[in-house]
Amino acid sequence: MITRCYLEITNICNLDCLFCPKTAREKRSLTPQKFDLLTDKLRGKIKFLYFHLMGEPLLHRHLPEFIAMAREKGFIPVLTTNGTLLSRAQAVMDARPYKMQVSLHSHEGNGKENLQQYVYEAMRFAIEAAAKGVIMVLRLWNQGGYDKENERLLDMVAGYVPRPWTQCQNGWRLADKIFIEYGRMFEWPEGEKSENSDGGAF
């Protein structure tokens, strides 16, 4: 049984990470009307609705509206973000997605942002969102050479949520509803990487 669906609400991203497979498709964002239509078709067929594929969902100005609409239709909304726009994502937090996953390696993939400020914004958001009931997952790669900053990042995170942490299946539980998880870099299902496919969220 299929329990989740990845719905690409935009393929536009504000970063250019080395580990991202990227896309050559036309830059587009889902309209509220199209989102309503697609979620109506998915209603009753899947449980978890992931607002993620190639783009950065926090760039979409209708994201809080989409989260609210998804909840009203019985979906469990989950977001994955590069974390660089969290300082202006209060409306997203207030819309209360079930879970938000923040890729802490977006900094390493670009090498432009101030790392301390990046971690500060991620942790400030995570602590506040968790207090409102949102599960916050901070993601770290464990392969492909992008794990060299892991210990440094963990030490910086510990400055906001001190150790000891509780070890869990894929990483650590830092506090109530705040986790660090290790994972592999994204791979297309069944090796499908063709840009000639008609697939996509649009």
Language-model features and meaning:
Residues R28-L30, Y50, K73-I76, D94-F202:
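Radical SAM enzyme [4Fe-4S]-AdoMet core and its adjacent flexible, acidic
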Residues M1-M100, G109-Y120:
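Conserved alpha-helical substructure of the radical SAM core
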